[in-house]
Design a protein with these regions (language model features):
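C-terminal accessory segments of proteins
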Residues: 165-179
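Catalytic glutamate of the conserved HExxH
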Residues: 29, 170, 174, 206
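Non-catalytic, topology-defining segments of multipass membrane proteins
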Residues: 1-166, 212-354
Length: 354
């Protein structure tokens, strides 16, 4: 009989974090989405961590993920479409040779030209063996529990790591909220974000896939974001891509208007005011919101024209003016949000009478 040592149990959780972050920070946000740039030492570290997760090569994983984003929810072209059912999206797509899951590297010319990516792809199986032997055996020897580390830090960790990743393809397209877009099935889910090292804010990710952050709010749990940010401060990463705050607020507010209309349609009979008046006020707020977006588009055009201009002084003057104007527009968006939230609070959410 073999009792697992405390050290072997700890190794399972630590190594789960190592391998999972190799997928989230490396395979996903670096190679699949190019959300930031990494130095060669960091790339090598992330490649080793990702190889330790045993989720196929960077090339295969990232290319398939790009296809998922391009054809999300399409039952014929999305490799793990949730519209084919939970188990298909979770892991069924890997168990048979479905056409949508066949690798097609036409969407990954950058990866095909990446020497490190191609090295890992060519020697993937030997690298998996070498990485596991090089990590698990020394740890097992140091804690005097080789079998415990091999079983917990090896097999059990792999089981947990795989299913945590699979949850993103399955549960994150079924369970949660859609605060940014309803054009696909992706959801934001705080519980899944904890389990998936920040990847659970999937609704945000599907509308803003090139942002290095998934948890964009300061309070949202996203260890992958923190790792990338810390790496940038250490000089190991640079050019972290961030979606402008205005774009994020615009998406959120557009969804709030949709939900306000839905709430009014469902609970309107219980509103303690004239329903026609409530609809008119929401319509007026939406018109003001649309005008703000139009003004924002005009400012972006002015910014583009200023950058095209040859005169450096003109660019400097325009930059200052545009910054002020953009700030004013952000304040207007915040005002629209406050007005809309006040309107929504007036909609009494009582059960619909039968």
């Amino acid at each position: 009989q073999h009792d697992f040592s405390l050290a072997a149990c700890i190794s399972m959780f630590v190594l789960l974090g190592v391998s999972s972050l190799g997928i989230t920070a490396g395979y996903h946000r670096l190679w699949a989405h190019r959300a930031y740039e990494a130095t060669l030492p960091l790339k090598i570290i992330l490649m080793i961590m990702g190889t330790f997760a045993v989720q196929n090569s960077i090339l295969f994983w990232a290319s398939g993920h790009r296809t998922h984003h391009r054809h999300v929810d399409d039952i014929d072209q999305d490799p793990y479409s949730i519209n084919n059912g939970f188990w298909y999206a979770h892991m069924g797509w890997m168990l048979r040779n479905y056409p949508a899951a066949e690798p097609d590297y036409k969407n990954a010319p950058d990866l095909l030209n990446d020497k490190l990516v191609m090295f890992q792809d060519k020697y993937y199986v030997p690298l998996v063996i070498a990485v596991h032997a090089g990590i698990l055996l020394p740890i097992g020897w140091l804690v005097n529990d080789i079998w415990g580390v091999l079983l917990l830090g090896g097999l059990v960790r792999l089981f947990l790591s795989h299913h945590v990743t699979f949850f993103i393809n399955s549960l994150c397209h079924m369970w949660g909220k859609r605060p940014y877009t309803d054009e696909n099935t992706a959801r934001d889910n705080f519980i899944l974000a904890i389990l998936t090292w920040g990847e659970g804010y999937h609704n945000y990710h599907h509308i803003f896939q090139y942002d290095y952050r998934n948890g964009v709010k300061w309070w949202q749990y996203d260890p992958t974001k923190w790792l990338i940010w810390t790496s940038s401060k250490l000089g190991l990463a640079k050019n972290l891509r961030r979606i402008p705050s205005f774009n994020i607020q615009k998406a959120e507010l557009a969804m709030k208007f949709k939900y306000a209309e839905q709430d009014l349609a469902i609970y309107g009979h219980d509103v303690n005011t004239d329903i026609a008046q409530m609809k008119q006020r929401i319509a007026q707020e939406y018109e003001a919101f649309t005008n703000t977006l139009n003004d924002w588009a005009k400012l972006k055009e002015q910014e583009l024209q200023a950058k095209k201009a040859a005169m450096a002084e003109k660019i400097h003057q325009m930059d200052h003016k545009l910054k002020v104007d953009f700030q004013l527009l952000e304040h207007r968006l915040a005002h629209h949000r406050e007005c809309l939230e006040t309107l929504v609070r007036n909609i009494k959410k009582a059960p619909v009478s039968e």
